[in-house]
Swiss-Prot record:
A cellular-component GO term for this protein: mitochondrion
Gene for this chain: Gtpbp8
Xref: CDD domains: YihA_EngB (cd01876)
This protein's name: GTP-binding protein 8
Binding site for GTP: 118-125, 147-151, 165-168, 227-230, 262-264
Molecular-function GO terms, alphabetical: GTP binding; metal ion binding
Organism of this sequence: Mus musculus
Length: 285
């Protein structure tokens, strides 16, 4: 039984995201990303490819390649294509659908789904607001008080995919959090990837470990996002990223090997994350 379970878990891990298609024609992108493309090269790398920028600060004896697990390394053209998927237009409606406290209350949808989980005050709502910055009519509420999100909130991104904002775990979490989240993660058939947010300033906490164990137990393909990278010095952030990367490499089986450092304040890493989401949901085909 254990061997079969491990085999199933590894099978889920080895599922590959759809390959990015070749740049065969000119695609339009958002004016905001067009401005990013005009940045000087060093600043452009920092905003679009923060992991690559961090890797440039590694000493030669710091373990080459440890930080640069860049399995997903799209071109600027591919990122530009993905940017347009997150831009609300008459033909690409991006909207809040509904909220639910139980899976049987959730909207029944066939399109691919991704969900975001993390402890209270990790910056989840701020990140989702940044992802939807090109959809000004979509309201993502941000509160200074941890634990503001109490339900599963469903957002539809055109005909491409649905994004689900889960309640935060830990401080002021809903009483039925475990039943709500576990049931969703185990039984939502169209769930393509779970994004687990970790505060880059604090690192992986005991509560985060519980969430990681849950993802591993359910054999879920998941991705670790490091939030608030603007809050630390370069040296401290690099130390944190190296520690978390080592944890992912040695202590997990279902976690995508590449970390995604993010700042919802400076937008660093947000464009790359949009492209990754568009890729794994098949939206770039």
């Amino acid at each position: 039984m254990a061997a079969a379970r491990l085999s199933h878990r590894m099978g889920r891990l080895l599922e590959k995201a759809p390959a990015l298609g070749p740049w065969t024609r000119v695609y339009s992108t958002s004016p905001a990303f067009a401005e990013v493309l005009r940045l000087p090269q060093k600043q452009l790398t920092k905003v679009v490819y923060p992991l690559r920028e961090l890797g440039q600060h590694l000493a030669a004896d710091s373990g080459p390649g440890l930080i640069e697990q860049r399995l997903f390394d799209p071109s600027l053209e591919d990122i530009g294509r993905a940017e347009s998927i997150f831009e609300a237009t008459a033909r690409n409606r991006i909207e809040y659908l509904s909220s639910a406290v139980r899976l049987d209350h959730a909207p029944s949808l066939q399109q691919p789904e991704v969900c975001f989980i993390g402890r209270s005050n990790v910056g989840k709502s701020s990140l989702i607001k940044a992802l939807f910055s090109l959809a000004p009519d979509v309201e993502v509420r941000i509160s200074k008080k941890p634990g503001h999100t109490k339900k599963m909130n469903f957002f539809k991104v055109g005909k491409h995919f649905t994004l689900v904002d889960m309640p935060g775990y830990g401080y002021r979490a809903p009483e039925d959090f475990v039943d709500m989240v576990e049931t969703y993660l185990k039984e939502r058939n169209n769930l393509k990837r779970t994004f687990l947010l970790v505060d880059s300033v604090v690192g992986i906490t005991k509560l985060d470990n519980i969430a990681i164990e849950m993802c591993e137990e359910f054999a879920l393909p998941y991705v670790m996002i490091l939030t608030k990278i603007d809050k630390s010095s370069k040296g401290y952030l690099l130390k944190q990223v190296l520690q978390i990367q080592k944890f992912v490499n040695t202590q997990t089986q279902g976690c995508f090997p590449q970390l995604f450092p993010i700042s919802a304040v400076t937008n660093s890493g947000v464009h790359l994350l949009k492209c990754f989401i568009a890729d794994i949901t098949g939206s770039l085909k």
